[in-house]
Amino acid sequence: MHGKILFKYGTMSSGKSLHLLATAHNFQQHSIPFLIFKSSIDDRDGKDVIHSRALGDRECISVSPTHNLYKIIAEYLDSCFLIGEETLKWILVDECQFLTEKQVEELAAIADKFGINIICYGL
């Protein structure tokens, strides 16, 4: 039960955040459980917001370089289990170039251990 990690990259203003928001919209329309992360280093549009000129704003979870992504997801999955929610299927990460090497390793562990697919968007 291994998940996949995909990396979508492009230059600035190439539509990466637009693609992330369109993907999130599609997941929401089809009731596919997902979370969105972005680095707290990117605070151009606000701390917990991803912005696209075409699709507007969407809330996300802002993570600092000291956050442990594996621990965040493990605790989230435990809470889903306790309240009977469907388990997480996808994680979308915006501005992934700002993640630490350790956080990238944590994403790989999340995909391997929990079978969650991850799409990272960045430069």
Predicted regions and their residues:
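Hydrophobic residues in beta-strands of the RecA-like P-loop NTPase core, especially within AAA+ ATPase
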Residues: 92-93
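Conserved P-loop
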Residues: 1-79
